[in-house]
């Protein structure tokens, strides 16, 4: 994924504040000669294959910062609520695993990966609120 990440970072540097637009990665990669030439070993991908790089490339700094604030607010909610400590720890470990920053991922925007991710995130929030053992 090295070529994809380098291309993504170049796209971000060209549009740092607002990004290239949501779901525009593949379109811009295929239709911009400079970007297409950066993909030597692979064809243009549909997305950058990392959720943080995707938000940075497609949404710019604004969207990446909002996404990180969103994740921290969920983690803060789980830590502060009065649920069972064991379930809170399980929820936090699951979230940390799902949103590990250096992991290759699917797109959160346009495929099943996003549906599953946000479903599991909701389950983790609910699980962390249980006060007694199940």
Mark where each language-model region is.
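Domain-wide signal for the mature, well-folded portions of proteins, strongly enriched
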Residues: 9, 29, 48, 52-53, ...
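Long extracytoplasmic/lumenal interhelical loops at the membrane interface
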Residues: 2-14, 18-59
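Short glycine-rich loop/turn motifs that provide flexible caps or phosphate-binding loops at active sites
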Residues: 18-20, 59-62, 113, 121
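Short, flexible micro-motifs
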Residues: 22-26, 63-66, 109, 117, ...
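Transmembrane alpha-helices of multi-pass inner-membrane enzymes
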Residues: 91-103, 107-134
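Hydrophobic transmembrane alpha-helices and their immediate junctions
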Residues: 35, 58-99
């Amino acid at each position: 994924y090295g070529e994809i990440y380098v291309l993504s970072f170049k796209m971000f540097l060209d549009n740092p504040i607002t990004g290239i637009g949501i779901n525009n990665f593949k379109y811009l990669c295929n239709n911009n000669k400079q970007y297409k030439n950066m993909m030597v070993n692979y064809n243009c991908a549909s997305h950058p294959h990392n959720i943080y790089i995707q938000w940075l490339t497609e949404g710019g700094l604004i969207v990446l910062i909002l996404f990180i604030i969103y994740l921290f607010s969920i983690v803060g909610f789980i830590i502060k609520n009065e649920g069972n400590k064991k379930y809170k720890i399980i929820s936090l470990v699951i979230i940390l695993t799902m949103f590990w920053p250096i992991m290759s991922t699917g797109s959160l925007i346009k495929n099943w990966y996003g549906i599953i991710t946000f479903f599991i995130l909701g389950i983790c929030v609910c699980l962390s609120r249980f006060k007694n053992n199940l």
